[in-house]
Amino acid sequence: MADDGPIIEEIAEKNGRVARIMQRLQHDTQRVTSVPGFNTSATGYADLIALLDQYKNDLEAVGFNDLEQARRRAPSVDITVGSNSTNLVDYSHGRHDMPSHRRHDSSDEEITAANSHHQSPINVGNRNDTDGTNGRNGSRAGSSSSDRVRMIAGRNRISKTRRYRPGQKALEEIRKYQESEDLLIPKAPFARLVREIMQTSTPFSSDLRIRSDAINALQEASEALLVQMFDGSSLISAHSKRATLTTTDVQLYRRLCLPNL
């Protein structure tokens, strides 16, 4: 009967070689790290790195030798016995039908898989330290977007909404309008209102034109009338011991001071 795998002696020999290499690695590591001042000297770190690289190559060589021995035993396997004959036909057709570059890639994948199976504990530790769950990279990947503070460009602190005391905003607006000389009503809407009133109140409005100076004069007079009316209405509301201006105050002011309107 054909031999399909390594025998017991080879497995024991391989485990013995790996154990001897690990013992030498432990002994040499203790020898390097036991030197006084090892943590503060660059030479000690360099010796330790060189030592790890050396034993890494030794462990990889052990795995490569096992792979070569498995390849040498492969021709002695009788694959024509039983159901293996069909596998032989399928395998031969698959290899011949496959392009040459794919055949080389598959061989490389087999070598890579074998090397990764016999990888040393040193490489396994390094790979675990660099994944997304441990070390610096782990802390960086674990931080969520909600933990980050988004700063506004050009500012050194986070902007906060200003809160005003009751009545402070109104006083600031009153001072702004008192100091400015601009009109309160925009000119374009007021001009449209004047033209609309002219079209509805006069039958021959299509032939009439109004100058911009006349519109400005009407706007000045209208705003002066509104300011005077609201000033008198606020006095009436203050006389009634109320702080809120209502429509009854405006109507009373019109009856008393503006009887013609």
Swiss-Prot record:
Pfam families: Histone. GO terms for biological process: mitotic sister chromatid segregation. Residues 113-127 have a biased composition (Polar residues). The lineage of its organism: Eukaryota, Metazoa, Ecdysozoa, Nematoda, Chromadorea. It is found in: Nucleus; Chromosome. The keyword NAD does not apply. Belongs to the histone H3 family. Residues 80-150 are annotated as: Disordered. Its main location: nucleus. Induction: Present at much lower (<5%) level than hcp-3 (at protein level). The record marks R71, R72 as: Cleavage. Keywords: Chromosome, DNA-binding, Nucleosome core, Nucleus. Residues 164-261 are annotated as: H3-like. Cleaved at the onset of meiotic anaphase I, likely by separase sep-1. One of its GO terms (molecular function) is DNA binding. GO terms for cellular component: condensed chromosome; nucleosome; nucleus. CDD domains: HFD_H3 (cd22911). It comes from Caenorhabditis elegans. Histone H3-like variant which exclusively replaces conventional H3 in the nucleosome core of centromeric chromatin at the inner plate of the kinetochore. Required for recruitment and assembly of kinetochore proteins, mitotic progression and chromosome segregation. May serve as an epigenetic mark that propagates centromere identity through replication and cell division. Not required for chromosome segregation during meiosis. Forms a nucleosome-like histone octamer containing two molecules each of H2A, H2B, cpar-1 and H4 assembled in one cpar-1-H4 heterotetramer and two H2A-H2B heterodimers. Residues 132-146 have a biased composition (Low complexity). This is Histone H3-like centromeric protein cpar-1.
